[in-house]
Design a protein with these regions (language model features):
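C-terminal beta-signal and adjacent terminal beta-strands/loops
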Residues: 797-804, 827-892
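Short acidic/polar hinge/loop motifs at secondary-structure boundaries
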Residues: 60-62, 158, 186-215, 235, ...
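Surface-exposed extracellular loop regions of Gram-negative outer-membrane beta-barrel proteins
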Residues: 187, 393, 446-449, 510-512, ...
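Gram-negative outer-membrane beta-barrel transporters
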Residues: 689-692, 711-805
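Outer-membrane beta-barrel signature, preferentially recognizing the C-terminal barrel domain
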Residues: 405-423, 552-565, 636-693, 703-730, ...
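Short, acidic, small-residue-rich periplasmic hinge/interaction motif at the N-terminus
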Residues: 28, 39-44, 73-77, 90-139, ...
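A beta-strand signature from Gram-negative outer-membrane beta-barrel systems
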Residues: 93, 202-244
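Transmembrane beta-barrel wall of Gram-negative outer-membrane proteins
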Residues: 295-398, 418-420, 616
Length: 892
């Protein structure tokens, strides 16, 4: 009886298992055939039985039903249904994009670049060589600023600021001077007081729709991007209401073991004594100062553990008046406490005083706000208004000491970038053959560093002379610009088309810079020293006597202008699988300066030149998902605003001098790239690039009489070449992103060398400044769609690169190869809430800088060595972690 029961039970179980089938399939876009990620698949009538398509668009759904109907839905697509039965094999569900009709205009209800699929589509359809990072990728990234996010893109490294945070982008090994930054396709000014490059750490990443890194320029783009261009595209108004908010907190592990140093920056006087007096030197009046003209409250320092980091953001977007008016507003705020610990073992050119230890404490208050409005008059006419404001306020203490002396710096900096753009897009004639767009721009960048104080301690007491210095600096950069483009499309037989496009732009830039510095001595004299612990315990208790006249005549007091006009003609020809883009751009530059206090030189000067910049781009579709690209283009790089000013700055080791005869750089650029997009969010790219720079700008030595100066100069020709590989591959729940860049460059400059007891000038060949020969990134992605869990582990490697250029042969400072590991994870709920966590710099690998073995260092004793050279310093930044909540609502 027992055997009969067991046999019956086994048969029943087997019968049941026969009906417990697993439905497998893919969801694809009906028009493009691309896989769709994140679509919900439900069996009709059983809402509790559902699945979500994975990273490759696939799904697996277990059911006991022998037949039924699958329903598939996703925002931006119409619901799709498909019948199944026990005989159904692997299914393919087609989904059609949802569209909104507006007076013959068809608007697809999807984000322009927010998803990985959209980012790959932009890369695939672009006419030139471009890499795109989507908002979704930035959201999942462990990073929260654009400067740190962008380093994960192919061919991009970043230059760090004094606290170790990423600040400037280096594209394909080309220094930051060789690329430019756009916001919504419009160039923005820089808050830097000498140069034109834009610090990317001022931008919070969460307000962006995508980042586009363009590596080959077309004729309708501004031509001064030898390395390329970084375009920060802000979020657009959605077709239906969207609301998102986030709040997170975190901490830097660096301050678990030590205190955070801060000072009372709120007590800083924003104007220098000279400015408060009305700048009397401009009117030949007395401008002497006394101790009463300076505050001491701002020099009060505190040692404490910092507050937790706070990061928050909010965005709202919707359309009104039947979809005609679109609104997108976003705001982001970050209050972060960062720092680094550094040990300087060897300082070239200085007497050995033992290891100098430096502790950096940096509080960052970062704010970003922007509003985008667009109004669709009809399907053919559209107006857009954009206003963006990016603000960074940074308070930093640098406390450096060795066995003999101590130097403390207290610095507060405020910089902002404001940009407002009005743009119109118009279409005319049948099938929109004729198109016109125009743009008006007003932008301003500003930076101020008031009362930047440095205090010098000798052992246990204040130095008697040169006890302190305090400086005020501020500068502004204002742009007014206009752009216009017009195009006409010709349709020919065999489905070929020709788009002729012409346009131009004009920008008027006005820049000014102010610098004022004061030196202080101890009023107590050499026989009555101010001893720590006896006469003072905090820096605001020191007695400091200013020298009567500060340095108000510094050459950093200057006004500059730049007027750029450009026109271009360009054609885009499409035939079958071939696309040809050819164009010619003409740019006219008038750049000049006026010194407020000229020194035995012309107080005014300017440079005028015109460049012809041809470009040709070929794109050939090898098959449906693979393309071969070839690009040639000529581009330029203009000197920095301060570099052509005939200034002289006295330094301890050598003097620095400007160069009014400095020429702009002209480069010829070649690109060859193979692209394969096996699926909508996957790619394989391999590309070669080659650049020949004529008159590249680097710093070298010149001799005038008995004096030697470090000055910006043109050094003949330089070559920069390399290879880039980019891979993205997704499986159902697992994905890989990887890229690798090899770059080789060479430039020959002048250096100092010893010939017996004589100092002579020689030439030496080296790579371009800031370039790493090897750069690699690897990200492992995990997506468990049904559980709502996504995770990412990211590693990056930056090879050895030139960190600081010496004026002596073989005495350059190199930064050793560096590995960084970061991770993030998030859990989403159906109610729209997501819990996330981010962790950075998990390995806490120190940054190591060293000088290769050379005659000046080979006989040094007592110094730690690396690969035979002398270690100059090590820096530690510590790990940081963050946890938070994100809420997202999208109207269906």
């Amino acid at each position: 009886m027992k055997k009969v029961f067991l046999l019956t039970a086994a048969v029943l179980l087997q019968t049941t298992s026969l009906w417990a089938e697993v439905l497998r399939g893919k969801v694809v876009d009906a028009s493009s055939g691309e896989d769709i990620i994140g679509a919900t698949v439900i069996i009709k009538g059983t809402p509790d039985n559902w699945a979500i398509t994975g990273l490759d668009g696939s799904f697996a759904l277990e059911t006991d039903l022998s037949s039924g109907t699958l329903i598939c839905n996703l925002i931006g697509y119409k619901d799709a249904e498909m019948q199944f039965n026990s005989a159904t094999g692997e299914m393919t569900i087609l989904m059609e994009q949802d569209v909104v009709m507006l007076d013959a205009a068809v608007i697809t209800a999807t984000g322009s670049g927010r998803t990985e699929v959209a980012a790959r589509s932009i890369e695939r359809n672009s006419v030139n060589v471009v890499n795109v990072m989507s908002a979704k990728a930035m959201e999942l990234s462990p990073d929260i600023t654009v400067a740190n996010v962008i380093k994960r893109m192919s061919g991009v490294t970043v230059e760090r600021n004094s606290s170790g945070e990423g600040q400037y982008a280096i594209l394909r090994g080309m220094d930051k001077r060789y690329n430019y930054t756009l916001v919504n396709g419009i160039k923005i000014p820089s808050p830097d007081n000498k140069n034109r490059f834009v610090p990317l750490d001022i931008f919070p990443s969460e307000i962006l729709d995508r980042i586009e890194v363009t590596k080959s320029l077309t004729a309708d783009m501004e031509g001064d991007g030898i390395g390329g261009a970084v375009n920060l595209v802000m979020k657009d108004a959605p077709e239906k209401m969207e609301i998102s908010a986030n709040l997170s907190t975190g901490y830097s592990a660096l301050f678990i073991d030590r205190d955070f140093q801060s000072f009372n920056y709120r007590a800083i006087q924003p104007l220098s004594p000279n400015e408060r007096m009305g700048r009397p030197e401009l009117h030949n009046q007395n401008y002497s100062v006394s101790a009463d003209d300076f505050t001491m409250e701002n020099l009060h320092m505190k040692w404490s553990r910092p507050r937790p980091d706070i990061v928050g953001g909010f965005s709202y977007g919707d359309r009104f008046f039947g979809g005609r008016l679109g609104v997108m507003a976003a705001f982001s705020y970050q209050n972060l406490f960062r720092g680094k610990d550094a040990s300087l073992y060897y300082i070239p050119g200085s007497a050995g005083k033992g290891t100098e230890n430096r502790a950096y404490s940096d509080e960052q208050n970062r704010m970003g706000a922007h509003v985008k409005l667009d109004y669709r008059f009809s399907g053919r006419h559209k107006l857009m208004l954009y206003a963006g404001y990016m603000d960074l306020r940074e308070s930093e203490v640098r406390d450096g000491y060795n066995d003999q002396e101590r130097t403390v710096r207290m610095k507060w900096n405020h910089q902002y970038i404001f940009n407002t753009t009005l743009k119109g897009e118009h279409s005319f004639l049948r099938a929109d053959r004729l198109k016109l767009d125009w743009t008006g721009v007003f932008s301003k960048a500003y930076s101020t560093t008031p009362d930047n104080a440095r205090i010098y301690i000798n052992g246990d007491h204040l130095y008697n002379t040169d006890s302190a210095d305090r400086r005020w600096e501020h500068n502004s950069d204002r742009d007014i610009a206009g752009y216009v483009n017009i195009s006409y499309r010709f349709d020919f037989a065999a489905n070929s088309t020709l788009d002729l496009k012409a346009g131009g732009m004009y920008r008027d830039k006005v820049r000014n810079s102010f610098f004022n510095e004061y030196t202080f001595d101890s009023p107590t004299g050499i026989y009555d020293l101010q001893i720590y612990g006896q006469d003072w315990t905090n820096f605001d208790e020191l007695l400091l006597e200013p020298r009567r006249f500060g340095n108000v005549g510094d050459p950093l007091n200057y006004d500059a202008f730049e007027r750029i006009g450009a026109a271009y003609l360009m054609g885009v020809y499409n035939w079958d699988r071939l696309e040809v883009i050819a164009g010619l751009r003409v740019e006219h530059t008038d750049q000049g300066y006026t010194l407020v206090f000229p020194r035995q030189t012309d107080g005014e000067g300017h440079q005028v030149y015109t460049d012809l910049l041809p470009s040709v781009h070929l794109k050939y579709g090898i098959h449906r998902n693979a393309f071969l690209r070839f690009s040639y283009g000529r581009s330029i790089n203009r000197p920095g605003f301060f570099e052509i000013v005939p200034y002289t700055i006295l330094n301890e080791d050598y003097d620095e001098q400007g160069n009014p005869d400095l020429k702009h750089t002209v480069a010829d650029n070649l690109d060859l790239r193979y692209e394969f997009f096996p699926k909508s969010s996957e790619q394989f790219m391999i590309g070669l690039f080659w650049k020949k720079l004529h008159d590249p700008i680097e710093y070298g030595l010149i001799s005038e009489g008995q004096a030697t100066y470090l000055t910006p100069m043109n050094f003949g020709d330089a070559v920069n070449a390399g290879v880039e590989v980019d891979i993205m591959k997704y499986f159902n729940w697992f994905g890989i992103k990887a890229n690798y860049t090899y770059t080789h460059s060479s430039i020959t400059t002048t250096k100092r060398a010893m010939d017996g007891t004589e100092v002579i000038a020689v030439t030496q060949t080296r790579p371009l400044y800031g370039q790493a020969a090897h750069v690699a990134n690897l990200s492992l992605l995990f997506k468990f769609a049904k559980a709502g869990v996504e995770a990412q582990v990211s590693g990056s490697y930056t090879g050895r690169r030139l960190s600081e250029i010496s004026n002596w042969v073989d005495n350059d400072i190199w930064e050793a190869g560096y590995v960084q590991l970061d991770a993030s994870v998030e859990k989403s709920f159906k109610c729209g809430i997501t819990i996330f966590a981010k962790a950075n710099n998990l390995l806490d690998m120190p940054v190591l800088r060293y000088i290769v073995n050379n005659p000046r260092t080979e006989n040094l004793n007592g110094y730690e060595r690396y690969k035979g050279g002398v270690i100059e310093r090590r820096e530690w930044h510590g790990q940081s972690a963050m946890i938070g909540l994100r809420y997202s609502f999208k109207e269906k």
